[in-house]
Amino acid sequence: EHDAITTYDDPCDIIEMPEIHRGVAVAYCDSPGPFETAELTTFYAVSPTPADWDESRVASFYREYNGHMLHNLTVHEAMPGHVLQLQHDRRSPRVTKARAAFMSGVFVEGWAVYAEEFMVSRGYAPRAAADRERAALAIRLQQLKMQLRMTINAILDVRVHSRGMTEDEGMRLMQVRGHQEEGEAVGKWRRALLTSTQLSTYFVGYVGVRDLVADVRAAHPSWTDRQVHDAVLAHGSVSPRHLRTLLGL
């Protein structure tokens, strides 16, 4: 409708995150494997709050993930973020098995964060909203908060694993500087301890994809949003620095 990007009708279900996968991320996109030929469903999984949290922490979590934030989260995880990007990936030429099997997390997360920014820049708001202009501004505010969270994710990742950051320091960084609710910060601290380098992919990837898209636009000033985005997604999940070469930049 807006000539923003090519979309597909591949099946996608929103599910409650299986218990075995909980405790790291609040949501994730689980797409068919890179060599899968059957038409399987992609799952957009969302985690409920842990059963052992008290009412105060649960309320804190849902203040963080309010209705406006969920729109931004769904842009990131589903459309036109991970779900759509991985649909393009499955249709890209399988030049080598290695490229298909080993996706660049920097590109995958970078695209999803870029998708958030792109959608709010075009005034995205749910059609059912009583006041779409007000809803668009609220989602824009949440996306700016997510930009701040993305930056803090990278700082947290580095300082936890190489600078000896304590839990108190991390919680203060997230809650005071990042304006995050306690329920979000507690979960993110656990995630920082359980993973390494992944939390940095959002910031590093966003900067790489944002700059790449800007350079594609500059090289092809007559192209529509759809042409630019389809070109960026046409080679699969390649790291931004190598994608530049594939795009002739």
Predicted regions: what they are:
Residues E1-L249:
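Long, His/Glu/Asp-enriched segments that create or flank divalent metal/ion-associated functional microenvironments
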